[in-house]
Amino acid sequence: MKQEQVQIFTRRISQCNKSGLVVIVFDIIFAYMKEAKECLSADDYEGFKEALKKAQAGVDELIRSLDFGYEVSKDLYPLYIFVKEAMAKTVVTKRLDELDTAEEVLVNLHEAFSEAAKQDHSTPLMQNAQQVYAGMTYGRTQLNESFQAPEHSRGFLA
């Protein structure tokens, strides 16, 4: 993943609530799946394996975040396991059909979680993070972001 993507995900994480964080994890998984496909088409098998390993780590994070006190978690768990197994098969076979099927499952779940996140108006997880203002200034070819009121103690409050 490129450094610019990492910065974008980092900024999004610092501004999101619990529901938004799940959506961001899906987006990170999609970024690594795209990277894996690009590596495979470029015959970079090591990069392919590494990207899929990181995508699987994202799915692992989704699995760890399940709360089995809710019925929906019992339905999500087998889907996440299916996706992990499809990724593992893709590494072995070097064929993208399993990965494409896994991606379809994840896209449907991403859409559902995105809709749920739109209805979640809870406060951001990181209460003491810098505020990011986009659209205040523009570069020649891109939108610049402005950070306001830098503080020394940012992030989670203990």
Question: Which residue stretches match the model-derived regions?
Answer:
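N-terminal leader/targeting segments and the first structural element of proteins
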Residues: M1-D67
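Short terminal interaction segments
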Residues: M1-R11, E103-A158
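Residues at alpha-helix boundaries and the short loops/turns that link adjacent helices
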Residues: A42, G69, T93-L96
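Short, charged, amphipathic alpha-helical segments
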Residues: K49-K53, K74-P78, L99-E104
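Short, charge-rich amphipathic alpha-helical segments embedded
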Residues: Q56-K74, H110-H121
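Amphipathic, charged alpha-helical scaffolds that flank and support histidine-based chemistry
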Residues: M87-E103
